[in-house]
Amino acid sequence: MSSVAVIGAGAWGSALAIQAARAGNDVTLWARDAARARLMAASRENPRLAGVRLPEQIRVTPAFPSAADFTLLAVPTQHLRALLGRLPAALAPLVVCAKGVEAETLRLPQEIVAEGRPGVAAAVLTGPNFAHEIAAGLPAASVVAAANAELREAVAAALSTPAFRLYGNDDPVGAQVGGAAKNVVAIAAGAVIGAGLGENARAALITRGLAELARLAVALGGRRETVMGLSGLGDLLLTCTGAASRNYSLGLALGRGEALADALAARSAVIEGVATAPALVARAAGVDMPICTAVASLLAGQTTLGEAITALLTRPRRDE
């Protein structure tokens, strides 16, 4: 048994806490809001995961734990740096469970950790996982990416169960690129379906989006084959087709003609692709990423959906 701290009591953090407890660990789940922590501790449920009970070995608290064998960081990428400044120094190693690119610095999550906690060992947990399915114990697979083989094996061993299979990978850059860029492509996939352009168009967009993920991963020092696995292709397929995908849902709304502000106001959860799109395009300077660039322009109000679609469809033909 290990002691696991999960920092962030949203749907994803709570699902990870449930999985860690299911794997036999002693778990502390940190919630930023004290009232929410009390409610979850008393009801043994997170309202965002209605119907799923928090196991008794999960302690919900608004106070940071003083120590843990592993600390899972399950807060949005845009809030990760500020959190690191408050986190007790004894909490290490760290497992980054966020996806995206920091808007201000263009850093990937593990890069933020390296700057905020220099010298601390860190891994990345990423893959095609919806929080409610993980919490419910449905079968899933994911990736623990870290250059340190002992760390990734230890994290995988601590969190794995027969229904939650964790694979190791020594390419955290490629794994993070897949997790970040797929949210942007998912907005485009939703817009295609929302606009009534059909399943053929979505399939083409997902496939060409995967090519963009691979080009960016290689440009940033990752490997193409990493993007072809769970952290890239797997996550891309789920996020571009799953009804529970927040980024895909936003794209659907935009494709149906909703204004971005209205679509965001109707959704309480963080839609990471909105902040990630412009940061990703900026980080990818010099890399050919027409789909992600079109999404960033659409979200910034620099182009209409019709103009973006026309621009993509009229690009010069080339070999695949």
Locations of regions flagged by a protein language model:
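NAD(P)+-binding Rossmann beta1-loop-alpha1 motif at the extreme N-terminus of oxidoreductases
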Residues: 1-53, 59-62
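Conserved active-site and cofactor/substrate-binding residues in soluble primary-metabolism enzymes
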Residues: 7, 15, 35, 75-78, ...
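Rossmann-like NAD(P)(H) cofactor-binding subdomain of soluble oxidoreductases
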Residues: 54-139, 155-157
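General beta-strand structural signal in soluble alpha/beta enzymes
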Residues: 96, 121-126, 166-170, 228-229, ...
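Internal alpha-helical scaffold of NAD(P)-dependent oxidoreductase catalytic cores
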Residues: 112-122, 139-226
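NAD(P)-dependent Rossmann-like dehydrogenase/reductase catalytic/cofactor-binding core
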Residues: 186-193, 218-228, 232, 236-320
